[in-house]
Amino acid sequence: MTEQISVGIVGIEYQLPCYKIDEAEIAPKIGWELNKIKIGLGMHEFGVVGHKEDVVSLALSAVDNLLVKYNVDPKDVGKIEVGTESHFDSAKSIKTYLLQLFNDNVSIAGCDTTNACYGGTNALLNCLAWMESSFCKHKYAIVVCTDISMYDSKPAVPTSGAGAVAMLIGRDPVYKVLPKTLFTYSTNEKDFLKHKSRYFPYIEGKESVEVYKKAFSNVYNEFISEFSPDYFNYMAFHSPFPKMVVKVCNEFNIPLEKVEDSLLASRHNGNTYTASLYFSLISLIASNKVKMNDVVCLFSFGSGCVGSIYCIQKVKEGCEIEDLRERLDSRKLINYEKYEEILENMQNYAIKDEEEDIKGYSIVKEENYFRTYIKK
């Protein structure tokens, strides 16, 4: 990225799953005290998809919300990049499903990116580079982060979650990306694996925490060697669970008041993988504390491992998030038995014909494994 062209986030929207489950339902089923989850992990509840929701329906809804909120002409979009690690199709990208929202615009570049929870940030960096290049002939690019996290490993269950974030990227941004602040760390790690033979991931929990901390240590120390720790006003993290973010902040002397407001979605919707960092950003924006010229530092991490740190600066008004708490509260609360039923169907890639209050796109049929989606 160059200094000459200002590129960044013009708008941001999101989609939550239709259900949620309280950690009080989870604790006795995994043999934990509730405080081990609420205090030890910082989790209160997490989002759960319905029988007619998947990563594509969440992405469709998030992008549709974005297009409507910012009155985007589909012809003005020239690139769509999707970050995900939970797509059910190894060949056809989620991006191609999203094209049903763009009428006759068949010249949209881009596809999907996968590297655990980092794919969304890689998609963003791709779109930023395209936006400031001579290849760009359009007004906007769109970045989508969409994921569903579910586990059969009991210690990981309380950190489940689901959701999608869509970001409108352009040359007249509300949040300008500051290119010289980007630092990346990447190594070959064996902390997390999704094998094609099974739905659920293999997790080395303690090792993954250490890899996360090692990645952060490397990029943050590089960052503060060139910029003061006071350079940024707020910080948002990829949040596997809120207490992990708090521990990292304490270890690196980052004031918690710079971070606390960003943890709302993580506490109440769980780990959304590629979308996690950007739900943290949404939570921070929703607090209405970010003022003109404030700098927000972002830390992205994906097991395996890739980690990056970079900063954005608010340079104009816009990008408001006014209803996050209300949308979190409006999800239907389910019990553990319902959760188990959904879990079983998800790992079998089954779709149950059940009436659900889905505010957005949902699966209407599956034929020869191809799924069709419509908006209610």
PLM feature spans:
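Conserved beta-ketoacyl condensing-enzyme motif
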Residues: 9, 55-115, 226-252
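Conserved catalytic cysteine-centered active-site region
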Residues: 36-40, 44-54, 86-140, 251-276
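A conserved active-site cap/scaffold subdomain adjacent to cofactor or substrate pockets
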Residues: 206-224, 231-245, 270
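Catalytic phosphate/nucleotide-handling subdomain of diverse soluble enzymes
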Residues: 282-329
